[in-house]
Curated annotation (Swiss-Prot):
Residues 28-68 are annotated as: deca-GX3 motif. It comes from Yarrowia lipolytica (strain CLIB 122 / E 150). May form a complex with LTO1. The complex LTO1:YAE1 may function as a target specific adapter that probably recruits apo-RPLI1 to the cytosolic iron-sulfur protein assembly (CIA) complex machinery. May be required for biogenesis of the large ribosomal subunit and initiation of translation. One of its GO terms (biological process) is protein maturation. The keyword Nucleus applies. The lineage of its organism: Eukaryota, Fungi, Dikarya, Ascomycota, Saccharomycotina. It holds the Pfam family Yae1_N. This is Protein YAE1. It is found in: Cytoplasm; Nucleus.
Length: 121
C-alpha cells in the first residue's frame, strides 16, 4: 500500500471514469431542470396572478350581488356557469395559459350583462 503523499500517478479505471462522468452529468442535468422549473413556475405565477385575481374579483361581485338580492336560483345558475371547470375551459385559454379573449372573460361578461339588466328592472 502506498502513502497518499507519494508521487505515484493515481490512475482511475475506465469504469470509474465513466461512473464519475455519469454522476456529474446527472447532477448537472438535475440542477438545470430544477432551475428551469423554478424560473418557469415563477414566470407563470407572475403572468397568471393578475388574470386570476381579476377573474376572482369579478366573479365574487356577481355572486355577492345575487346573494345580496336574495336571488337564490340565479345564484345557483351563476355558480354552475362560472365554475372553475367552465372558466378554465380550453376554449378560453391557449396551451401557454394565456387568455384567448380580449378584456373580460366571456362567461363573466354574460353575467355582468345579466346583472345590468336586473338592475334596470
Amino acid at each position: 500500500m502506498s502513502d497518499i503523499w507519494d508521487d505515484e500517478e493515481v490512475r482511475e479505471t475506465p469504469s470509474e471514469i465513466t461512473r464519475v462522468k455519469r454522476d456529474h452529468s446527472q447532477a448537472g442535468y438535475l440542477a438545470g431542470v430544477t432551475k428551469a422549473k423554478d424560473e418557469s413556475l415563477q414566470e407563470g405565477f407572475n403572468a397568471g396572478y393578475p388574470i386570476g385575481g381579476q377573474l376572482g374579483l369579478s366573479i365574487g361581485r356577481i355572486f355577492g350581488y345575487l346573494q345580496g338580492k336574495g336571488l337564490v336560483e340565479e345564484e345557483k345558475q351563476a355558480r354552475k356557469e362560472l365554475s372553475s371547470t367552465r372558466i378554465f375551459d380550453r376554449q378560453y385559454w391557449t396551451t401557454d395559459a394565456a387568455p384567448t379573449y380580449e378584456g373580460v372573460h366571456p362567461l363573466v361578461k354574460q353575467w355582468e350583462n345579466k346583472i345590468d339588466v336586473m338592475k334596470r328592472e
